[in-house]
């Protein structure tokens, strides 16, 4: 079980966090947890972490002793009003040196709190079938598997399942 670090604080992202979040994004992902094609964007001189679909206010930042340790991106799963009650976690990253210290748990708890405050009834996410560590964390925090898209991605010549998980909030 992860050791919870009482020094972890979570706050809303600010525009000035962009460079730090881009760096964190570049060092946090591996082919087992993220898409190599997306990871390659860190080398693009025109890459911006924040976009129209993912502005600063869509992100929560975890800090340990005032240093950026992780982030979570929370946004609607679609633009349709019929799914306005569902928010999705569209990215969760923790710096390698800050793993297993409660950073991801703190981010997920803060995202759940924010989702509830925004009136969401369901919080969903997707995780690679190869990322057993993340899947166990999500299950421990009350997320359940809602579907599996078999062989959805081909990463490094290997087919990987896309696992849809969700937590019902109401």
Where are these regions (language model features)?
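Acetyl-CoA-dependent GNAT
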Residues: 3-8, 12-18, 23-97, 108-110, ...
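Short hydrophobic/aromatic beta-strand or adjacent loop that forms the aromatic wall/cage
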Residues: 57, 160-164
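Flexible nucleotide-binding loop
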Residues: 101
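Short glycine/proline-centered loop/turn elements that form peptide/ligand docking sites
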Residues: 104, 108, 130-134, 151-156
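Conserved GNAT acetyl-CoA-binding A-motif
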Residues: 115-126
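Conserved catalytic-core motifs of GNAT/GCN5-like acyltransferases
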Residues: 124-127, 139, 144-160
């Amino acid at each position: 079980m992860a050791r919870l670090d009482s020094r972890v604080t979570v706050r809303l992202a600010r525009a000035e966090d962009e460079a730090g979040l881009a760096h964190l994004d570049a060092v946090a992902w591996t082919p087992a947890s993220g898409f190599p094609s997306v990871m390659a964007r860190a080398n693009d001189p025109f890459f911006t972490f924040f976009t129209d679909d993912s502005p600063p206010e869509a992100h929560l930042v975890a800090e340990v002793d005032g240093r950026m340790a992780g982030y979570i991106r929370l946004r609607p799963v679609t633009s349709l009003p019929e799914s306005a009650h569902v928010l999705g976690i569209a990215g969760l990253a923790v710096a390698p040196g800050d793993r297993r210290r409660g950073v991801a748990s703190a981010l997920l708890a803060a995202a759940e709190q924010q989702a509830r405050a925004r009136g969401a009834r369901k919080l969903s996410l997707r995780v690679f079938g190869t990322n057993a560590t993340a899947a166990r964390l999500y299950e421990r925090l009350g997320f359940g598997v809602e579907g599996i898209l078999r062989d959805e991605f081909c990463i490094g010549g290997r087919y990987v399942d896309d696992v849809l998980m969700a937590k019902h909030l109401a």
